[in-house]
Amino acid sequence: MRIIGLDVGTKTVGVALSDPLGITAQPFETITRKENNKLRRTYARIEQIISEYDVTEIVVGYPKNMDDTIGERAKACEEFAAALERRTGLPVTLWDERLTTVEADEVLEECGMRRENRKTVIDQLAAVFILRGYMESKQK
């Protein structure tokens, strides 16, 4: 009954997983998107994680603009989420991700992590914030 949270960017996808009970969210990995593979390898890796960890639900960060409008990145996330739903047959929820990367960067800075080292984990941490927000809303 795990849930996977995804922070989809143009170059990377941050991945977070819930525990089997769906209570906590942990950083899992960052998938690097290479231009030449388009999204095929990205989808394949996500599908592999879903299979290995018995994921039953997918949450994709939805980067709305601060004025609540839908921009190009949000449209790309809508397409990504729709493709994941088609490919996996699992329910996919778009979750407002405004400022999650900023929040993740601030947390890493407070922990004393150097800026150049943050790149490897910032997307995973943003995915944790997306997933945690979604799970907390379900508990209410």
Swiss-Prot record:
Keywords: Cytoplasm, Hydrolase, Nuclease, Ribosome biogenesis. It comes from Lachnospira eligens (strain ATCC 27750 / DSM 3376 / VPI C15-48 / C15-B4). Belongs to the YqgF nuclease family. It is found in: Cytoplasm. This is Putative pre-16S rRNA nuclease. PANTHER family: POLYNUCLEOTIDYL TRANSFERASE, RIBONUCLEASE H-LIKE SUPERFAMILY PROTEIN. Pfam families: RuvX. The keyword Hydrolase applies. InterPro entries: RNaseH-like_sf (IPR012337), YqgF (IPR005227), YqgF/RNaseH-like_dom (IPR006641), YqgF/RNaseH-like_dom_sf (IPR037027). Its EC number is 3.1.-.-. GO terms for biological process: rRNA 5'-end processing. HAMAP family: Nuclease_YqgF. GO terms for cellular component: cytosol.
